[in-house]
Structure formats: C-alpha cells, structure tokens
Amino acid sequence: LSPEILNYYKENHVAPIREFNPMKDNTDTDIAFQQAIVLGSSEITILGATGGRLDHFLSIVQNLKTAWEKKIPAYIVDSRNLITIPVETSFEIRKEEQFGKYVSFFPLEKEVASITLEGFAYPLDHHCLPNTSGGLCVSNEIVEETAHVSYEGGILLMVQSRD
C-alpha cells in the first residue's frame, strides 16, 4: 500500500486503519480475516489473493476453513476465480448465476464422503472423493439450468472459474 493511498484513507476516514509490526506470527490477511469474524461479519470476501505468493494463498484457503467452521460464507475472488468452502452439505448452483464456465471440487481432508453431482457434464452419484483423486472433479461444467451438489462428510473446496 503506497503512503499516498494510506494517507487518503486516514484523512478521509474511509475505513478504520490498524497498523501492525511487520515482524509477527500472522499474515496481514489472517489478522483482517479474524477481525471480520470478531466484528460479526455474515460473509467474508478476500480480493487480490491469488496473484502472488502461493504460501500466502494457501494460508488464505485455511482462512476459508476457519470461516466454514463458524458457518460464515467466505470467498476468495479474482477476475477468473471464485473459491469457497460451501457451508452447507447440499446446495444448488444456477447456471445463469455461476461465476464462469467451470466448477471444480477438491477434498480438504482425507475424503469427501458420498458426493453427488447432478446437472453437470460429469455427474457423480454418492461417490467417495479422496484427497488423492487428482483431476476427477476438475473443470466440470453445468449442463442443466440448475446443478445440485450434496455430500455427507468432509470439507469440500469449490472453485468456479473462467478462461
């Protein structure tokens, strides 16, 4: 953040500004994420998190898990991707409202149990999706007006993307 932009926000009271020592155990995004939870946010969206260091990006994916544990919808969004851990184990995606063309699913634990994908080009019916599944659920496409996703256990990371 340039000094000019920081001064603009400070002088115009656009948002509360908190400054931290750069020598700390948490990333700036971790601190912002925790603050959003403490303030009672009903939804959290992180912008600009995918274009730089992968270690920071993976840390932010862990932040999504923290929000999921508290049943708070949280998203990582850039111009080509919307990444989330859905808080419900059964949900719909309307084709006209989806972000991009592709939908991918990844287990964040050992497995996602009994995943069912309906309305997709590559459907699944009560399939066990292990974390060793590779590309099984990558770049699927919605082929019906509404796609349905359900599963019975595990933590499911969903990526909606476009070229």
Residue map of PLM features:
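Class I SAM-dependent methyltransferase SAM-binding "motif I" and its flanking Rossmann-like core
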Residues: 55, 65-98, 103
